[in-house]
């Protein structure tokens, strides 16, 4: 994950980089990653972000986590999504300035990639603060994101017949910001 943005003179420059994973009810690999319709016509999933390095103006965001829960019907990337809703959980470790910054970034109000994503979703149901556990295997073989008692999302890396032992299938977005 690497994203940044600037919108108006009232919104400071920002940049975050780290890990972004998602899991949903669709077949693997997720059709959304390739701008295709959901496997069963609708999607319900969890997006997890771990910010390794980030800033919003002078506010440091390093080490914080954000989880998003969303659902929609139709191909979201083709502009055909209906009933698209999304809600966020922001790491309770964040102080007040960090909370405000993360709300601006992930609601899309700070511009950049997340603003484009927010346009696709339309209905953001709310933002809550919660303890978020995020775990990623060093070899990328699995990841887990959890809000105890509320959300558990976990996945294992894709492998295939042509994947060398110990290596993982990865989709890389070459876009640089």
Protein language model regions, located:
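Short Fe-S-cluster ligation motifs
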Residues: 54-66
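Bacterial Sec-dependent signal peptides at the C-terminal "C-region" and cleavage site
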Residues: 1-5
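Internal, well-folded beta-alpha domain core
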Residues: 63-177
């Amino acid at each position: 994950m690497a994203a940044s943005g600037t919108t108006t003179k009232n919104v400071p420059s920002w940049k975050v980089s780290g890990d972004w994973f998602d899991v949903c009810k669709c077949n693997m690999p997720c059709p959304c990653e390739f701008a295709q319709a959901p496997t069963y016509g609708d999607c319900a999933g969890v997006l997890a972000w771990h910010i390794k390095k980030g800033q919003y103006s002078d506010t440091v965001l390093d080490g914080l986590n954000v989880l998003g829960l969303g659902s929609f019907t139709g191909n979201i990337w083709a502009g055909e999504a209906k009933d698209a809703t999304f809600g966020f959980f922001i790491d309770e470790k964040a102080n007040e300035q960090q909370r405000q910054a993360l709300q601006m970034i992930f609601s899309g109000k700070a511009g950049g990639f997340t603003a484009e994503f927010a346009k696709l979703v339309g209905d953001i149901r709310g933002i809550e603060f919660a303890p978020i556990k995020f775990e990623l295997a060093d070899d990328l073989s699995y990841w887990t994101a959890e809000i105890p008692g509320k959300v558990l999302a976990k996945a294992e890396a894709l492998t295939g017949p042509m994947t060398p032992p110990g290596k993982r299938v990865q989709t890389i977005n070459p876009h640089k910001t």
